[in-house]
Amino acid sequence: MTNRRYESVQSYLFNNRNNKIDAHQFFERVDTAEAQIIKNNIYDNTVVLNRDVLLNILKLANDVFDNKAYMYVDDSEVSRHYNAVVKMKRLVIGVRDPSLRQSLYNTIAYIERLLNIGTVNDSEITMLIADFYDLYSNYNIELPPPQALPRSRRPSVVQPAAPAPVPTIVREQTKPEQIIPAAPPPPPSPVPNIPAPPPPPPPSMSELPPAPPMPTEPQPAAPLDDRQQLLEAIRNEKNRTRLRPVKPKTAPETSTIVEVPTVLPKETFEPKPPSASPPPPPPPPPPPAPPAPPPMVDLSSAPPPPPLVDLPSEMLPPPAPSLSNVLSELKSGTVRLKPAQKRPQSEIIPKSSTTNLIADVLADTINRRRVAMAKSSSEATSNDEGWDDDDNRPNKANTPDVKYVQALFNVFTSSQLYTNDSDERNTKAHNILNDVEPLLQNKTQTNIDKARLLLQDLASFVALSENPLDSPAIGSEKQPLFETNRNLFYKSIEDLIFKFRYKDAENHLIFALTYHPKDYKFNELLKYVQQLSVNQQRTESSA
């Protein structure tokens, strides 16, 4: 027993707008009284119209427009899964494993058979599609990218040792607080030559006062303007030049007065009696004393500077401008320019060498640009249009040839003529399509001609010996082939295309579209046939 599910009549009509709907079966499933009255007036595919039937038809149409009419459906619709089957066929083209490709084709053929019968529910078709993608994903997993392994190692570089020294610092700070108060003060040193007392025990880290500012660094003063900074720099330069020749002899003697941090307590020299417990660790050394300020030099007691030696006028530097001249220039806003120094003749680069250097640089840049443009043009995809508008290469492909080969290639990728045949036929067809695909990416005239010859050979290889559309209809009911067997009709149209009978294929498709004007497959094949016919005529006329 089939499971019934209800849906609105409006959504049912939208989903099945490309399918043939039986009127008697449709009105039987609509759950309204008006639909049942209309169904009772259908005799031999003919509706008997009267006043009551017309009123019921108007009421039903109003309910469908307002989305108030519902119906029950038992089977799945073919149009929901048709696009999925087309995508699956395109994916199988890139599979090179023969056994896997054959199993994928068997799954596609089984789904198409169920869709043509129309007695399977959506869940079964969904499971079959899921099985197809499971097989296809396993085929892709077996080929990992080569850079997957180095990328996975990058996150393993971790530096966890950064916060480790934090607890050790805390222990060093707490040890002096526990040991120093219990230790006796050190006795005076027996050395009579050193009058300095032993250093006091260092305070704990928590009791240390903040470090005083360095005496040599003055506090930052208020910001000065440009004139004051210039005057201050001139004064410092004059003081530095005055103190430069002064070298006091007492400086080395005064630099050795700081020896207090090197004194050790007496207990470090005397032997200690053995004890059961280990001796406590010695207290840490006191922090180093701040550097001593430079000794003050008394200029009055310093020896006079050595007498200046007269230099020749050529070796003397130019006199520095006086302070009054600098201030007057700053007030007036005029600044004297320094005289330009003449470059020696040996350092001057001749003009001819400069032009040669510029020409070499431009030539290298133009060559790199040409190489980049050549690479970018070879990477154009087959979907780009107008790719050769700005290409002036002598070997560029003709636009009608490119469109003709692309249309024929698209017919082969979605063809049903060779998908369910023997494995040898499928293997040869897919190998040829795999060879044609890189030729379409680099669209030169040579590659397009090669692709065209390969596709024409493949067309003659997969063409049927007899086309069903050429034989007349047999029987009293002369129904067209697309009504009785749509899958065979698709194969017959593709056979006409592969035999280059584009006009016959176009006539059959136009006739089929009179019955089903919105059918997706009919419109797609008609578009390909028209492209092939037009571009073939252009190619023959240009040749």
Swiss-Prot record:
Q: Where is this region: Disordered?
A: 147-222, 235-325, 373-400
Where on the tree of life does the source sit, at the highest rank?
A: Viruses
Identify the species of origin: Autographa californica nuclear polyhedrosis virus (AcMNPV)
Q: Which GO terms describe its biological process?
A: actin-dependent intracellular transport of virus
Q: What is this protein called?
A: Protein P78/83
- Quaternary context: Forms a complex with proteins C42 and E27. Interacts with host actin-related protein 2/3 complex. Interacts with protein Ac102.
Q: Which residues form the WH2 domain?
A: 226-246
The answer to keyword NADP applying to this record is no
Q: Where in the cell is it found?
A: Host cytoplasm; Host nucleus
SUPFAM superfamilies assigned: Formin homology 2 domain (FH2 domain)
Q: What ranges does the record list as Polar residues composition bias?
A: 375-384
Principal subcellular localisation of the protein: host cell
List where Pro residues composition bias occurs: 182-221, 271-321
Please give the function described in this protein's UniProt entry: Plays a role in the transport of the nucleocapsids from the cytoplasm toward the host nucleus together with the host actin-polymerizing Arp2/3 complex.
Which keywords appear in this protein's UniProt record, sorted alphabetically? Answer: Host cytoplasm, Host nucleus
Q: What GO terms fall under cellular component here? A: host cell; host cell cytoplasm; host cell nucleus
User: Would the keyword Repressor be found if you checked this record's keyword annotation?
Assistant: no
InterPro entries per record: WH2_dom
- Gene Ontology molecular function, alphabetical: actin binding
